[in-house]
UniProtKB/Swiss-Prot annotation:
This is Phosphatidylinositol-3-phosphatase. Virulence factor that plays an important role in blocking phagosome-lysosome fusion and thus participates in the intracellular survival of the pathogen. Acts as a phosphatase that dephosphorylates phosphatidylinositol 3-phosphate (PI3P), a membrane trafficking regulatory lipid essential for phagosomal acquisition of lysosomal constituents. Therefore, SapM eliminates PI3P from the phagosomal membrane by catalyzing its hydrolysis, and thus contributes to inhibition of phagosome maturation. It catalyses: a phosphate monoester + H2O = an alcohol + phosphate; a 1,2-diacyl-sn-glycero-3-phospho-(1D-myo-inositol-3-phosphate) + H2O = a 1,2-diacyl-sn-glycero-3-phospho-(1D-myo-inositol) + phosphate. Disruption phenotype: Strain lacking this gene is defective in the arrest of phagosomal maturation as well as for growth in human THP-1 macrophages. The mutant strain is severely attenuated for growth in the lungs and spleen of guinea pigs and has a significantly reduced ability to cause pathological damage in the host when compared with the parental strain. Also, the guinea pigs infected with the mutant strain exhibit a significantly enhanced survival when compared with M.tuberculosis infected animals. Residues 1-43 form the signal peptide. The C-terminus of SapM is required for interaction with RAB7 and SapM-mediated autophagy block. InterPro entries: Alkaline_phosphatase_core_sf, Phosphoesterase. Keywords: Host cytoplasmic vesicle, Hydrolase, Secreted, Signal, Virulence. The gene is sapM. SUPFAM superfamilies: Alkaline phosphatase-like. The keyword Secreted applies. GO terms for molecular function: acid phosphatase activity; phosphatase activity; phosphatidylinositol-3-phosphate phosphatase activity; phosphoenolpyruvate phosphatase activity; phosphoglycerate phosphatase activity; trehalose-phosphatase activity. It is found in: Secreted; Host cytoplasmic vesicle, Host phagosome.
Length: 299
């Protein structure tokens, strides 16, 4: 169990309840960015095969701004009791291409946030899971309706929701965060879920303390449940605060995770490669050449 945070010591029943600059990118154009890194089949490895994985993506903070920061006690408790990847880096700036890298193995040449992006039926983590008989769902805070493709709505931003860009991920699998299960229903979670807080709660517009409190309120129960239910929580960031170094926090917490600080260099492609390896999925995009993370797992 996580320690040192009041909310995590309570019973689960008391846990806190633009116009596109480069236009629509046709699937045929996007395919030209991935031609050199084809989808490659891979047998399931000896990595743990989790019943459920929840991936939370935060915004625009460097590792130095988060790890050791007293304004982020929940995240630092996850880091202290999980696998803290001390040399994790994003691919580029700004936000959107990093989300695409994490979800589909490629930035697709984006150099600015663009809406809409049309990824067509190019392979991605969601489509791979579905093709292999697993399940996927994306939970986005303030998404105005199931399957909505709007570019923005209040504090919701489509640029942070990569699965919406692909026709091989059914729109019914893009849902508001309000649909995220309560603790008693965690066994019904999809195989892999993405959780995207709104711009206030992902540290983009709001403070580190606000983002940490949101995670504590909404994901602490899942984090504790995951430890004893063959499940995993991954918390990462899209990019840092705009520096050329682009070093980001990334933490794995849950069952089979051996706590510690790990110093191998990783990127969003390595995280994607790890998830694909866990479920025996084809490696897609630049995940093809990104080794999976193998040293953080124990009994």
């Amino acid at each position: 169990m996580l320690r040192g945070i009041q909310a995590l010591s309570r019973p689960l029943t008391r846990v806190y309840r633009a116009l596109a600059v480069i236009g629509v990118l046709a699937a045929s154009l996007l395919a030209s960015w991935v031609g050199a890194v084809p989808q490659v089949g891979l047998a399931a490895s000896a990595l743990p095969t989790f019943a459920h994985v929840v991936i939370v993506v935060e915004e625009n903070r460097s590792q130095a701004a988060i790890i050791g920061n007293k304004s982020a006690p929940f995240i630092n408790s996850l880091a202290a009791n999980g696998a803290m990847m001390a040399q994790a880096f994003a691919e580029t700036h700004p936000s959107e291409p990093n989300y695409l890298a994490l979800f589909a193995g490629n930035t697709f040449g984006l150099t600015k946030n663009t809406c809409p992006v049309n990824g067509g039926a190019l392979p991605n983590l969601g489509s791979e899971l579905l093709s292999a008989g697993y399940t996927f769902m994306g939970f986005a805070e303030d998404l105005p309706a199931v399957g909505s493709t709007v570019c923005s709505a209040g504090k919701y931003a489509r640029k942070h929701v990569p699965w919406v860009n692909f026709s091989n991920v059914p729109t019914t699998l893009s849902v508001p965060f309000s649909a995220f299960p309560k603790p008693q229903n965690y066994p019904g979670l999809p195989t892999v879920s993405f959780v995207i807080p709104n711009a206030d709660n992902d540290m983009h517009d709001g403070s580190i303390a606000q983002g940490d409190a949101w995670l504590n309120r909404h994901l602490s129960a899942y984090a504790n449940w995951a430890k004893t239910n063959n499940s995993l929580l991954v918390v990462t960031w899209d990019e840092d605060d705009g520096s050329s170094r682009n070093q980001i926090p990334t933490v794995f917490y849950g069952a089979h995770v051996r706590p510690g600080t790990y110093n191998e260099t990783i990127s969003h492609y390595n995280v994607l490669s790890t998830l694909e390896q866990i479920y025996g999925l084809p490696k897609t995009g630049y995940a093809t050449n990104a080794p999976p993370i193998t040293d953080i797992w124990g009994d």
